[in-house]
Amino acid sequence: LCKECAKKLSPFFSERRRSTVEQIREQLDYREANKDRVAGFNTTRTLGGDTKVLLDEDAQCFIVTSSSRWRDANPDVMDFSQVTGCDSEVRETRTEIYRENSEGHRESYDPPRYDIDYDVYLTIHVNSPYFDEITFKVNDSRIEERYSVEFREAERQANEIREALTSLRETVRENVAAAKAPKVAVTCPFCGATTMPDANGRCEFCGGAIGL
């Protein structure tokens, strides 16, 4: 795989070494087609900080990107229906603190002492042929104290993204289920005819709005 082709693969794809040439070609075709979806993407809502989750609620899809010129970056456009779950995680970075002894040498405390910083990560689990999850750091800079204002804000953003994607996914699935449900004949309150409401919930005879 040449460097130029490697750059075109999804940033969320991590199975390159275990993929066949044909699988790589399929993904490159998908990434090329994705450019059209990016071009037509209309942001209706923005969540997150430096790494943003952009929602196109009209087209029922979303993008995760940290690029300010995200259209040029060709981020993967995912459908709300592809989301299978979301979960957040707090990761700790422990850096040992040392002291200087009487001889001027650095040594550990007994017991050892650590400076602990925190990062909040969100993982969006997705149903895609090319990757299973999208993981990114929610906070823009490392958090020094747990339960600080910065920590709570990162947790709030993670929860907001999770709740938004989960809710939108359920709405899409409910709409699909409703569309597949068998239609039931009803009596039109306007003309009295027995009718099967059309896709807009209107009587097929008089056009009256009778709902679905």
Segments from the language model and where they lie:
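Short Cys/His-rich "knuckle" micro-motifs
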Residues: L1, F12-R16, V90, P197-R202
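Short cysteine-rich clusters marking metal-coordination/redox-active sites
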Residues: C2-C5, C188-C191, C203-C206
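Conserved beta-hairpin
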Residues: A39-Q82
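Short, flexible, mixed-charge glycine/proline-rich loop motifs
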Residues: E174-A185, G192-D198, I210-G211
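Acidic, Ser/Thr- and proline-rich intrinsically disordered linker/docking segments
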Residues: T84-K183
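Netrin-like (NTR/C345C) domain of secreted extracellular proteins
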Residues: E4, F13-V21, E170-A181
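Short Cys/His-rich micro-motifs in 6-15 aa windows
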Residues: E4-R16, C206-L212
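Alpha-helical interface/anchor segments and their boundary "cap" residues
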Residues: R17-R37
